[in-house]
Regions:
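Catalytic cores of DNA base-excision repair glycosylases
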Residues: 7-143
């Protein structure tokens, strides 16, 4: 079961079948506009399609690929650390994974656990719009 598609067409909606990808999208979109980050994110997924593959990536190769986005050194190291931790992860506390802050945790709760009604309103603008939309939709379906 997937979270419903919204008129906002968030990238997380497209990759929600893979929780690792949801988290990676959040790292790419953190402090970077979607329109700028998206092409590089898809290049990343083409090169490293799974957490297991990305866990063996050379951070320098990722850094060179995403240099234009800014924060490339930090992001590249975080992507590898996240992937390494993810393949070992017990699935309990997503916030324990490297690079997972409030934004990524909220996206994970919404798109992977389908807990949009149980979490507080996210602070991220696009995620907040989705959260409002889906919670409004839930209420109108019940009424």
């Amino acid at each position: 079961v997937n979270a419903p598609k919204s008129p906002y067409n968030l990238i997380q909606e497209t990759v929600q079948y893979d929780p690792w990808r949801v988290l990676v999208v959040c790292i790419f979109c953190n402090l970077t506009k979607r329109v700028v980050a998206e092409p590089y994110m898809w290049q990343f997924f083409d090169r490293w399609p799974t957490a297991a593959a990305a866990s063996h990536a050379d951070p320098a190769e990722i850094r060179d690929m995403i240099a234009i986005l800014g924060l490339a050194d930090r992001r590249s190291k975080t992507l590898v650390k996240l992937s390494q931790a993810y393949v070992q992860w017990d699935g309990v506390d997503v916030r324990s994974l490297p690079g997972v802050g409030e934004y990524a945790a909220a996206a994970y709760d919404i798109f992977c656990l389908h807990r949009w009604a149980q979490i507080p309103e996210p602070k991220d603008g696009a995620l907040k719009n989705y959260w409002k939309w889906i919670n409004g939709k839930e209420e109108s379906q019940v009424a």
